[in-house]
């Protein structure tokens, strides 16, 4: 369980994110100093192009392969995957033996609230940030009304401008932690009770 940094700033989970952030700093500065553009926590591009400007919140994404995550409107699903070393080869073999890809066993239909949260997470974690006008057009409210954004701004992890909400350089380093703060209780319960 991820605890809010506002309620338990010295929780074990938060300290792990702090350690991850410290490990992240040196290579991040090295890449930036050498002209790379950071587009997400783990993605740096050396020759930015117009492809780097594409929004991260609305594309239809159909993933292929073992563990691929797909986003099709309000449907979110993934093919089976494992992180256990001794199970990886078997999972890939099972995937390669699949003949019917029209059936998914690991997915669900997102509620409007979950779609809103997904839009926030996907855009906030991307270097262009969240477009406020697009958010308001989709969800009928201003993202400035979300208390968590004010709390992240107080920590200087986001920059809230007239038209966008973007992670700061420090916030980008904590993006694994920040993204989890936006996960709904319903999704968190599904994650915690999922059995493989």
Regions found by a protein language model. Give the residues of each.
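C-terminal scaffold of the Radical SAM
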Residues: 1-139, 195
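Basic, amphipathic "hinge/linker" alpha-helix immediately C-terminal to the N-terminal HTH DNA-binding motif
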Residues: 115, 165-172
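Extended hydrophobic-aromatic, low-complexity segments
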Residues: 132-133, 144-145, 160
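Short amphipathic alpha-helical interaction segments
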Residues: 139-154
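A short, conserved structural fragment
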Residues: 153-163
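Short, amphipathic alpha-helical interaction segments positioned at domain boundaries
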Residues: 172-196
């Amino acid at each position: 369980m991820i605890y809010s940094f506002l309620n338990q700033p010295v929780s074990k989970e938060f300290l792990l994110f702090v350690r991850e952030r410290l490990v992240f700093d040196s290579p991040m500065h090295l890449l930036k100093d050498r002209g790379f553009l950071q587009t997400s926590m783990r993605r740096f591009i050396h020759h930015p192009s117009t492809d780097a400007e594409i929004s991260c919140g609305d594309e239809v994404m159909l993933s292929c392969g073992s563990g691929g995550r797909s986003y099709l409107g309000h449907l979110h699903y993934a093919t089976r995957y494992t992180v256990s070393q001794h199970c990886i080869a078997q999972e890939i073999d099972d995937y390669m033996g699949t003949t019917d890809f029209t059936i998914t066993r690991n997915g669900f239909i997102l509620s409007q609230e979950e779609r809103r949260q997904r839009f926030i997470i996907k855009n906030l974690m991307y270097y262009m940030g969240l477009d406020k006008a697009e958010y308001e057009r989709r969800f009928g409210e201003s993202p400035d009304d979300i208390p968590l954004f004010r709390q992240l701004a107080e920590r200087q992890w986001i920059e809230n401008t007239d038209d966008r909400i973007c992670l700061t350089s420090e916030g980008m380093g904590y993006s694994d932690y920040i993204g989890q703060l936006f996960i709904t209780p319903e999704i968190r319960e599904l994650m915690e009770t999922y059995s493989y």
